[in-house]
Amino acid sequence: MMEIMIRKGKADDAADLADVETACFPPAEAATAEEIAARLSVYPSHFFLLYADGILTGFIDGMVTNEKDLRDEMYADASLHDEAGDWQMIFGLNTLPSYRRLGLAGRLIEAMKEDAKKQGRKGMGTRTKSWTN
């Protein structure tokens, strides 16, 4: 059985998080280390990192806002974060491919959800990528 630990983000996590992000998203969609560092500098407590047996295997992150709907600009502009906002956004839910289908992503969502509830948020919001065959 894996030992699971979830913690909040720190400024010096950017490079490690970028490595996970790169493993989880196509290059055109993956946030860079610089983009992640900018987010961490503004809202580190809205990053949740999951370690399985001491290995960083995934993370979830997103800003807080008074807007119910996630806009593209929010990904690029960390200054849009409003700690007093009503809505916790989810920008990315990342799990390394070799650790998928183990329930780890669900644990990350639950950690963010519980934190949002404790902070009195109205809810959480995200977007998914559209695709067609």
Each language-model region and where it sits:
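Glycine-rich phosphate/pyrophosphate-binding loop shared by adenosine-nucleotide-utilizing enzymes
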Residues: 4, 55-59, 88
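A short beta-loop-alpha structural element at the N-terminal edge
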Residues: 4-17
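Hydrophobic adenine-recognition pocket in adenosine-nucleotide-binding enzymes
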Residues: 9, 93-95
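Helix-loop element at the rim of GNAT/NAT acetyltransferase active sites that forms part
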Residues: 19-33
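Conserved beta-hairpin
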Residues: 46-60, 64
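Conserved acyl-donor/pantetheine-binding loop and adjacent beta-alpha core of acyl/acetyltransferases
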Residues: 60-93, 100
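Conserved acetyl-CoA-binding loop-helix of GNAT-fold acetyltransferases
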Residues: 95, 101-114
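Conserved GNAT acetyl-CoA-binding A-motif
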Residues: 109, 116-129
